[in-house]
Design a protein with these regions (language model features):
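Flexible loop/turn connectors
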Residues: 8, 12-120
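Short beta->alpha junction loops
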Residues: 1-9
Length: 120
């Protein structure tokens, strides 16, 4: 619908800005793997090399990121869901805030660094 169309338009604006010869951005951190893949495809169509001209990373570490070799932050979704459920279930005082640290992992792939397998 309209929301998806507007979303695509914003990604297209990002692609146009990053395609300008005077860009100063060397790395882009995108909010999810699907949007990162769209941006990578759009930049490649404009002759921008990934990661030589601009590095791209995203969030979620989905199968798309794994297949397309997109650097991605892997978030422990099951742990987050379980913790959220427990917090709601055991919430005693509505005004109290309990802090929890959740560890994510950065999975480095070819969208952010050129990997030479023979030199490993």
């Amino acid at each position: 619908g309209e929301r998806v169309s507007g979303h695509i338009q914003i990604l297209d604006v990002i692609i146009e800005k990053l395609s300008e010869p005077d860009r100063t951005c060397s790395c882009l951190l995108v909010y999810n793997d699907i949007a990162a893949n769209y941006i990578i495809d759009g930049l490649k169509e404009k002759g921008i090399s990934i990661p030589e001209d601009i590095a791209i990373a995203s969030f979620d570490n989905t199968l798309l990121a794994q297949t397309k070799k997109i650097t991605s932050v892997a978030q422990p979704v099951n742990e987050i869901a379980h913790l959220a459920f427990q917090m709601v279930k055991h919430q005693q005082q509505p005004d109290s805030i309990e802090m929890h640290e959740i560890v994510s992992r950065l999975i480095i792939r070819e969208s952010s660094v050129k990997i030479n397998i023979t030199s490993l």
